[in-house]
Amino acid sequence: MAEQPTFEQNLSQLETIVNQLEQGDVPLEQALDQFQKGVALSKQLQATLEGAEKTLTKMMNENGDEVPFEQADANE
């Protein structure tokens, strides 16, 4: 079983795809393939970020209650 790429690896791959597409010298079929890969990577990255955000919102305050991250940040 292959290891899952890290967030940083996926982000780097997405940046490479974006750079290739921005240069505009990629054949159409390859550009479409790269675009599809980029969309899939973007969705994976978004899911990872949402998971991290949910983890951070479970920060505990002094009373042991869970508080949303925005409230914890405002209390500092």
UniProtKB/Swiss-Prot annotation:
Biological-process GO terms, alphabetical: DNA catabolic process
NCBIfam families in the record: PRK00977.1-2, xseB
GO molecular function: exodeoxyribonuclease VII activity
Localization per Swiss-Prot or TrEMBL: Cytoplasm
Protein name: Exodeoxyribonuclease 7 small subunit
Subunit: Heterooligomer composed of large and small subunits.
Organism whose genome encodes this protein: Lactiplantibacillus plantarum (strain ATCC BAA-793 / NCIMB 8826 / WCFS1)
Keyword Transmembrane helix: no
Gene3D superfamilies cross-referenced by the UniProt entry: Exonuclease VII, small subunit (1.10.287.1040)
Protein EC: 3.1.11.6
Pfam families attached to this UniProt entry: Exonuc_VII_S
Reactions it catalyzes: Exonucleolytic cleavage in either 5'- to 3'- or 3'- to 5'-direction to yield nucleoside 5'-phosphates
Record-stated family: Belongs to the XseB family.
Listed GO CC annotations: cytosol; exodeoxyribonuclease VII complex
Keywords: Cytoplasm, Exonuclease, Hydrolase, Nuclease
InterPro entries assigned to the protein according to its UniProt record, in alphabetical order: Exonuc_VII_S, Exonuc_VII_ssu_sf
Domain of life: Bacteria
UniProt keyword annotation of Secreted present: no
Coiled-coil blocks: none
Its job: Bidirectionally degrades single-stranded DNA into large acid-insoluble oligonucleotides, which are then degraded further into small acid-soluble oligonucleotides.
Lineage: Bacteria, Bacillati, Bacillota, Bacilli, Lactobacillales
